[in-house]
Amino acid sequence: AWAGLSVESLDEEATPRERRQAYARDITYATAKEVAADWLRDRLAASRASPSRSVRTLAGMLAEGVALPGRSVTADRLVMRGLAHAIVDEADALLIDEAVTPLIIAGDSGEAADERRGAAFRAAATIASTLAEVDDFKVDHAIREVTLTPRGRRKVAAADVQGVPVLAGVRRREELVVQALSARALHEQGRHYLVNEGKIVIVDEFTGRLMSDRTWRDGFHQAVEAKEGVVVTRPKETLDSISFQRFFGMYRRLAGMSGTLSEARRELWSVYSLPVTMIPRHRPSRLRRLPLTAFVRGEDRWRAVVDAIVELNRVGRPVLVGTRSVEASEALSIRLDQVAIPHRVLNALRHREEAQVIAAAGVRGAVTVATNMAGRGTDIRLGTGVEELGGLHVIATELHESERVDRQLAGRAARQGEPGSVQVFVSLEDELFVRFASLEAAAAQRLARDGVVPPMVAKAVARVAQARAQALAKRRRSDVLQSDDQLRDSLGFAAKGR
């Protein structure tokens, strides 16, 4: 206890009894995913014990900590005691960027994971491999959607599916083929997922970490399994679901903190009624920002990144290089090996030595290549003599959809009044420009000289792309907020029918 308050932390291995004990304390430390999952499990237990009550009513009672009828339910099943007060670290990441991420409680669908089901997904993947983009299907990269053309639909309808009864119906066949095309065209191994010990493991796009306990819904996970040639697993049934946006909106008192909240102030107020207050810096910032450098070709960008690392390493400055995917971090590592630059890599594949890698990232001569795992909340301390060299230098090799995420990476340098610098290298072939500023990128390419886009032009195109990306993300968050009630009610009806 501290200041008369009881405190306890909660981890994913905790038993229901340990969870109940942790939530009984005055202050409970836990991840948002753990807290929201516990609340969903409580709601499921309550709905099964009180089938006559609507899910909306039960949700309100659980949020307020109102005692539920049925002594055994409260004593043996529920672990939480209401949603009173929450303080959220890195609040913009959770309340804005991950707001639409659905937290799902899944159970066995009851469908057999037999050879027929696996054969259906594999057959759909085979059919998809015979289709040509543009002629047979179109990919909208902005909204990440695949649609069949009339010619593509005819080819799918004419495909030989003898021996695959699941695909006998043309509509179901089209659904699985579109999923297979989405898995092929929009989801890359090394960026969106990894194949680990014969299983598909999703990579969290915000943190760069593996999510071993997560699967995609509605058969898409099975489509990716078929694409990669691993065992097609049994599909899961969604028992209950809620978005972080809806969940945190139920707290009576909500607060949070982050170094990148100012850009999200309007949405935080409109969705959560939370004002944003700026806290003055403890010490003046000494961060030096170098101009954005944009190349037409991705290959030229990577050459420039390696050249910059070599030059900085020659004088002994530590360098942190941020990449957006596991694949990119591994490819850059190979390039650094080719020029004999000692370095360490931190990504979802190489995470076991995370603490040691971060601890050494600020020492003289260190070169660290990392995904978003080295972004938010990472404190890199400078080694002896590094401050005199100019501090940590951060290199971003690609822009994110949100400028706030880019600022989080840049913020690893020049902490607590120390010196530091940041430099951004991009290519017009990057996903951000392909999805959100293809026309502007084409115009910028015409203005390029020797494969390099003028800095002011590059900055303008990047600003347009990020603005469009954020506008789309905001619309999605608004749609989720409106549909969450409908989803909750439909799930509640299904629960009462079981």
Task: Show where each model-derived region lies.
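Conserved P-loop NTPase motor core
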Residues: 1-451, 459-498
